[in-house]
Amino acid sequence: MIARADQSFKYLRLLSEQFPTQQAVFTEIINLQAILNLPKGTEHFMSDLHGEYEAFLHILNNCSGVVREHVDDIFGDELSEEEKGDLCTLIYYPHEKLALAHLQHIATPSWYKVMLERLLVVARSLSSRYTRSKVRKAIPRDYAYIIDELLHTHPDENNYRVRYHERIIASILETDAGEDFICSLSDLIKRLVIDHLHLVGDIFDRGGGASKIMDRLMEYHSLDIQWGNHDLLWMGAAAGQPACIITVLRNNLRYGNFEILENDYGISLRELVAFAERTYQPVAPNATGFTAKLTPMAKAINVLLFKLEGQVIMRHPDFDMEDRLLLGKIDRDYGTVVLDDGLPHKLATNDFPTVDPGHPYELTDEEQALVDRLVEEFTSSGHLRRHIEFLYSRGSMYLARNRNLLFHGCVPMNEDGTFSSMSCLGTWRSGRDYLDFCDEIARRAWRERDEDSLDWMWYLWIGMKSPASGRLVKTFERSYIDDPSCWVEPMDPYFELTKDEAICDAIMAEFGMPSGSGHIVNGHTPVHTAEGERPIRANGRLLVIDGGFCSAYHPKTGIAGYTLISSSRGCRLKAHQAFESVEAVLTRNADIVSETDRFDVAERRRMVSDTDTGVQIREQISDLRALLEAYRTGTLEERP
């Protein structure tokens, strides 16, 4: 019998408020036991979106081809390839497909009826994997009752029930509600196909659609995010870290995406443009290639960046980045800089009017005023703040879930396979302890905005021992030296060592994961498929799913991105070809072509009981059994 002063008694008393009778407890235990024996929900893994909104949206809508697989399985030869393609496109883009159907004058009542019935067949098939309660919660609220009724039509029902359901369909069409129901069913199908989305970092930069991606993610039903270095950069910028802000500007200048700053986030660059034009020399009319890129805007941003980075590096000797203090090593007489190789390298420009050779990292008064204004612009953008708050609420440095360990970049390592130590505000940390520190310091930066934590946001973006970066980034060399041999960026030993299954096992063990099973899932480093690289490494223990969403990387990677599907039947890696356009999908059913690589095939279907959710459910059942015992023994009274 439980003592009334016991903590467990207090917990059971609270639990009894939710389940006040034995019957209520019985019902919940039966429900939870049933859930344990359902197939696990399908998990969808994506990484390194880099602002490619249309490609991201299509893969989100087609669920990496899983929607088409279900349509093929359900209808087989009953429908032609064109009919199945039309149905899939309707599921992907219901509003756009309906608008096109009207333009083509095919949106007749009979067309609506056929499409509604086909969508219902797909939705019924998918809903059989879940409890009715979960399906009801997934149905758009406005039509929950009617769609729930339609989903539970069975071929063996009596004629009265069949006529009842036929009458519902007829009423939908008579009241011109067909479009709303088609859109609602299409959304429901996509929610039932994918139970949960894992986004393994790097939403921002390169492509111009990061703001749209964030808006869409904020509407998604279930997801988590593992922060990438580009995400952490924007998080630092939104918190007001000056070097992060200038780096964001540099990245968007490089890819021609200032619209995301000015139009999406309302950040004015007018003062920066004016400052650059009056301070720096214009590009020479005969300039080509590398030097043609050194516009006044580029030169202004570069100098601001290297001054601000230099200040951070000098504040933090523990970052061990003194080799990046190159602005002060410029020989203005010869227009050269001496790098670590001890040799002078010719600079593509000698236009440094605001750099004081005696104090190279000090901002001029005009530069300081400009930086202060940019900090104000970034920290006062409401739209950006909402996006960053969402990144914090759904994101983390890493996630251990369902036998998988997810993080964007690396766990810093030494050449001998041990975890590399990093001085973290006076304490040396390594492995999981270090990633936990990085997670906390990132949250502190947003919460407290103190200089130390903000400077760490910059380090997490660029540092050699940053788990989100893991390489020696050579921004200065890439900005000023027209010699690709100077641009080589050494990588953390992690990226080579994790080709070894034993190293992957050691990393999994460090994070409390079971040995000999599961996977490490990374993004960050594009898989050069065209050069023979493979995303499945270390005998399947490491999966690298950055296949190059960014269109600029397609020639290097040979594909347009990898995604991962983990279902009750095992894992599948999807290699996607480039996305053509939404218009091509609508007019020609031009879906993304994807190759599937099956691995970790389940000998028996994986059920909810085999997942982390299953562990939680069994704990709930144990608590409910204790509550039931308390009712039976009289320790707690029922409240009918």
Model region roles, listed by residue range:
Residues 1-640:
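Feature recognizes metal-dependent phosphohydrolase scaffolds
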